[in-house]
Regions:
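A structural signal for hydrophobic residues in beta-strands of small regulatory alpha/beta folds
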Residues: 88-89, 126
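A structural signal for short, well-ordered beta-strand segments
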Residues: 36, 85, 120-124
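Residues at or immediately flanking beta-strands
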Residues: 76-77, 115-123
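Short catalytic/binding micro-motifs of nucleotide second-messenger systems
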Residues: 69-74, 102-115, 152
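Conserved long alpha-helical elements within nucleotide-processing catalytic cores of c-di-GMP signaling
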Residues: 4-7, 16-35, 42-69, 78-82, ...
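Catalytic-core segments of nucleotide cyclases and related cyclic-nucleotide turnover enzymes
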Residues: 53, 97-104, 121, 126-159
Length: 159
């Protein structure tokens, strides 16, 4: 029981950073292509500061549910930080892109009628697109892409 809890995020029920690291180590041993979708929830601090941490927790939980629905049985979802998640998928680049589209749709649907806005920045990376397709490199690429998306979204809001 305790070993299982060590790999679970209490708030969301998703795998935590330790579970993601364990999966990445297993992926490194495999030759199968894989990809990551990094997800960063926008404005969580603003929700926590204005509406309180219980509302922020509800937002995190809602995004986690969006990720689980989007990944369905094709991928694994992890909460790796306060407002950061990663979805890992094996198979094809097309499956990765389709999952990212489903995440965007799920998050947009969660935003409809919400008392606070729900949006997320996404970054994708596929192992076969990398010169060094090890999990750490693919993760860095997805993380960089997520921050670029976050910057683009902020610029669009300010325009």
């Amino acid at each position: 029981v305790y070993a299982k809890l060590a790999y679970r995020d209490v708030l969301t029920g998703l795998g935590n950073r330790a579970a993601f690291v364990r999966e990445a180590q297993e992926t490194k041993q495999s030759a199968a292509p894989f990809g990551y979708i990094m997800v960063d929830v926008n404005d969580l601090k603003k929700v926590n500061d204005t509406l309180g941490h219980p509302k922020g927790d509800a937002l995190i939980h809602r995004v986690a549910q969006c990720l689980q629905r989007a990944a369905a049985e094709k991928g694994n979802c992890y909460r790796i930080g306060g407002d950061e998640f990663v979805v890992s998928l094996n198979g094809s680049r097309e499956a990765l892109l389709a999952c990212a589209d489903r995440i965007r749709e799920e998050v947009a649907a969660a935003d409809a009628g919400s008392e606070f806005p729900v949006s997320a920045a996404l970054g994708l990376a596929w192992s076969e697109d990398q010169p060094d397709p090890i999990p750490a490199q693919v993760f860095r690429q997805a993380d960089d892409a997520m921050y670029a998306d976050k910057k683009r979204m902020k610029a669009n809001r300010e325009a």
